[in-house]
């Protein structure tokens, strides 16, 4: 059993190795390799900087002009339960979920307490919380994202369709794309409407066009 002084020494070694030396190592590696990849194409680059990442990642991405990924349910500011789309950086892509997350409709039904906090705090709406994520709620959420300062707003097709109660998929759970913990559950989602039918939905198309136009995006 180590005494207090030895424990503190091992803690300093551990902290330096994992949070300082490794940070510098991966940053130096990125600055050596990524510019070669970035210069090989004219594509705009986005990095998936979610979850636990080294402290050097945001600085390195900014230096290389790689857009960050911003998701309201995965805030990057300590102490925040939900990120505020109005505060997203310009050099970012904002969206409501990734392919490995539950889409909004299914997430809404997962945890009633968390949903209530999102409804009251993130959306700023009082009163009882609807059991389902209704189309009007979707429009409000998508408006928040469209009006964010982020350079790009890229939203899942499921969310766009969910702004229309008649066109959205009947089963919210089947809108999920991947479940990382289930090896065979990947890339499962299929749009339930033929493209030809979707093109004929003038009410939906005009509504989405107006939402995008009002936000100043194209």
List where the protein language model places each region:
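Catalytic cores of glycan-processing enzymes that make or break glycosidic bonds
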Residues: 1-218
């Amino acid at each position: 059993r180590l005494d207090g002084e030895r424990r503190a020494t091992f803690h300093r070694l551990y902290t330096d190795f994992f949070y300082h030396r490794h940070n510098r190592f991966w940053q130096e590696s990125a600055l050596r390799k990524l510019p070669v990849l970035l210069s090989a194409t004219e594509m705009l680059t986005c990095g998936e900087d979610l979850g636990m990442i080294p402290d050097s990642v945001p600085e390195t991405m900014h230096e290389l002009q790689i857009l960050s990924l911003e998701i309201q349910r995965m805030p990057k500011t300590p102490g925040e339960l939900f990120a505020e789309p109005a505060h997203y950086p310009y050099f970012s892509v904002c969206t409501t979920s990734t392919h490995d997350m539950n889409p909004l409709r299914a997430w809404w039904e997962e945890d009633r307490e968390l949903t209530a906090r999102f409804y009251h705090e993130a959306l700023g709406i009082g009163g009882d919380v609807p059991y389902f994520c209704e189309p009007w709620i979707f429009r409000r959420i998508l408006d928040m994202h469209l009006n964010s300062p982020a350079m790009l707003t890229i939203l899942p097709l499921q969310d766009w369709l969910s702004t229309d109660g008649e066109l959205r998929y009947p089963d919210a759970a089947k809108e999920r794309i991947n479940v990382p913990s289930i090896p065979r559950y990947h890339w499962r989602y299929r749009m339930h409407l033929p493209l030809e039918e979707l093109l004929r939905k003038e009410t939906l198309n005009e509504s989405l066009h107006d939402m995008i136009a009002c936000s100043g995006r194209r």
